Amino acid sequence: FWFDPNRVAYATEYIESKLVEFDPSNASEYEAAGKAYVTELKGLVGQVSELISTIPSQNRKLITTHESLGYLEAKFGLEVLSTIIPSLDSANEISPSQLVGVIDVIEDNNVKVIFIEAEAPSVYAETIVAETGIKAVEGLWVETLKEGQSYPEFLLDAVELIVENLRNTD
């Protein structure tokens, strides 16, 4: 859910309410911090929308290592046509027929970029790149923050990497 700032805002409000419940003497501090963060998250929705809007609609197709961008796809209009590992668990294996299926999707849809997540590099991606000539983009962080990174920085870094590599793929 972390690729949809509105869902993160909802979680923030829930956490705030529980903190107020458990520590009412500091309620005003929790409420002020929660309100400020939710406001920041609402602004983040606009930033992400604006960035993605710079990608021509025909270039918004992508392939990833595993199913991690569903909320980004649903909220902001990207189209994840296939994943190398068809689950959220990057430890899962892929069958040869599934690998061929991903290659077929790439070729049938003229997909130009495959995003390889930093936390779970895939040997399967190397095979796909070799077979299709698709551009491999490494370093997409989808599951964890880098040391010292905030959630808004995490989201914007991921979106900027995606936008940079999809914007001019014709």
Language model: regions and residue ranges:
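Extracytoplasmic metal-acquisition and chelation regions
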Residues: F1-D170
